[in-house]
Design a protein with these regions (language model features):
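Conserved helicase motor core of SF1/SF2 NTP-dependent helicases
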Residues: 12-22, 29-290
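Short, small-residue-biased leader/transition segments that mark boundaries at the very start
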Residues: 2-7
């Protein structure tokens, strides 16, 4: 309540909130430009550390699809730095390449990812006749993963309704961890999760329950959703589907699509000034980082 009044007074009286010196923002892609403009106005004397992955903005209503506008607003000074962390330590090469090919089906800019050289099993895509066969396949795959010693396994569903249906179907044959992902009660075992609850998490193995063209049409919003689902897997990834497989997987990626990179990638190549001149060291931190 007190902070809300501070922000209100700042906007109303054209003053600056002075009780914060540095702001750290994680999952930065989930906030829209209006939120950043408000922060910049209310906390104009702060320094910022902003981290995120625009490929993981799975909302079609808000958030960022590229860093370009944010850079213009939040990083205008000569001492501001924009960096792209290209190295991925999470996924195997096979999973990373599979997920990156999904991204290329979108119309938005793509930032390059370089997986560490850690190879694993190829990504498996299996067609099922109906829901019953999907459940049978899921049971077999989960038990095979458990026999390999994979401790954390996620069955990723498109939404809550499908997750509830799959949970009910698997409970008789697979021991499930029924912790509430929305409340961050994540532990070892097998979890059946709606896709939106998996963002920010990782599992030894992931089973995408139904990657059909109906659940994941070739549209930007679904590109990012399927990308997020695939990149939750550390070691093994299997994709099931019934009907027709989504074009995000089956459609080939053209050379032109693979050349589509964000303009922000080029911006990173520009030299960044990191040394403060002697005359500037006599200024206060507030003046230097204004």
């Amino acid at each position: 309540r007190q902070r809300q009044m501070c922000i209100r007074d700042s906007i109303k009286e054209d003053t600056v909130i002075r009780e914060t010196g540095h702001v750290v923002i994680d999952e930065a892609q989930d906030f829209g430009m209006m939120a950043y403009a408000s922060l910049k106005y209310c906390l104009s004397k702060c320094t910022y550390t902003i981290m995120g992955d625009v490929a993981q903005n799975i909302s079609d209503r808000y958030g960022l699809n590229d860093w370009t506008e944010l850079r213009k607003l939040m990083l205008p000074g000569e001492f501001d730095y924009f960096g792209i962390l290209q190295k991925s330590y999470r996924n195997t090469v096979e999973i990373s390449e599979f997920a990156t090919d999904i991204l290329y089906h979108g119309s938005f800019p793509v930032y390059p990812v370089e997986p560490i050289i850690r190879h694993g099993e190829p990504v498996t895509v299996k067609k099922c006749v109906d829901f019953t066969e999907q459940v049978t396949q899921a049971e077999q795959i989960i038990k095979a993963w458990q026999s390999k010693g994979l401790d954390t396994i996620a069955v990723v569903c498109i939404d809550e309704a499908e997750a509830e249906k799959v949970t009910a179907a698997l409970q008789g044959s697979v021991e499930l961890n029924t912790g509430d992902a929305g409340k961050w009660e994540i532990g070892e075992g097998v979890m059946v999760l709606p896709l939106k609850y998996t963002k920010g998490l990782e599992f030894d193995a992931v089973l995408i329950f139904n990657a059909s063209e109906e659940d994941y049409p070739v549209e930007d919003g679904y590109v990012k959703q399927l990308y997020v689902a695939a990149t939750r897997a550390l070691h093994e990834l299997t994709v099931l589907y019934r009907g027709k497989l989504t074009g995000l997987i089956v459609d080939p990626v053209s050379p032109e699509q693979k050349q589509r990179m964000s303009l922000a990638v080029d911006a990173q190549k520009k030299p960044v000034k990191t040394v403060v001149k002697q005359a500037e060291t006599e200024k206060t931190k507030e003046e230097i980082y204004r």
